[in-house]
Amino acid sequence: MTQESYDYANRHGLRPISWNDFHGLCQAIALAAAEFKPEIIIALGRGGFYPGTLIAHLLRTEIYPVRLSRRVNDVVVYDDPVWLLDPPALVQGKRVLMVDEICDSGQTLQVAVEKLVAMEVAAVKTAVLYSHTWGANIPDTIGLITDALLLNPWDREAVVDGRIQFHSEYVSAFAQQGIPLEDTLRIPATKFELAKRP
């Protein structure tokens, strides 16, 4: 099945992910990844930085960021993923766990794995927090398979006109599915006054 990335009209339902859900998914992935004994974790940014960092802490493994994306400044600008930050040369000869947030088409993971294989890693495995059904055959490890619209705790809000508001991409996705925009879907964060600011 061919599926357009970011086509939110084809999502079925809504799945808010809490910070507790995120932590539990990362724990499950870390336990599975421990059997592989990764020497390095490569986190695909931006979304993969969150799970990659927690999984690296759980496994007490070194982590390195890479940027392979269709997006620049949160806007889709490329038809195919483009390398913005390559993996480090020190991956050569190492067992690498590549971590991303989601597998949609699978193209980003495939391009990244091809690059690591070309860099002569000893072995590479992939892990994602989530996959849609049409991409589930790509990652080695998946925390959750769903075709729902996923609301991550780290990207559902953005600063707009000096205020924290729903991210515009989610607002559009809600509209495409006919889902009402409700404050209950926002992150119930504690409000802080800064101790110091410039």
Regions found by a protein language model. Name each.
Residues 58-96, 105-113:
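Short, glycine/charge-rich flexible loops or terminal/linker lids adjacent to PRPP-binding catalytic cores
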Residues 33-37, 90-92, 120:
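Glycine-rich phosphate-binding loop signature in dinucleotide/nucleotide-binding domains
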Residues 39, 94, 139:
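Conserved acidic residues
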Residues 1-37:
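Active-site-facing substrate-recognition patch
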Residues 37-45:
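Short glycine-rich phosphate-binding loop at a beta-alpha junction
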Residues 40, 64, 97, 125-127:
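A structural signal for isolated positions on well-ordered beta-strands in alpha/beta enzyme cores
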Residues 2-9, 114-198:
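PRPP-dependent phosphoribosyltransferase catalytic core
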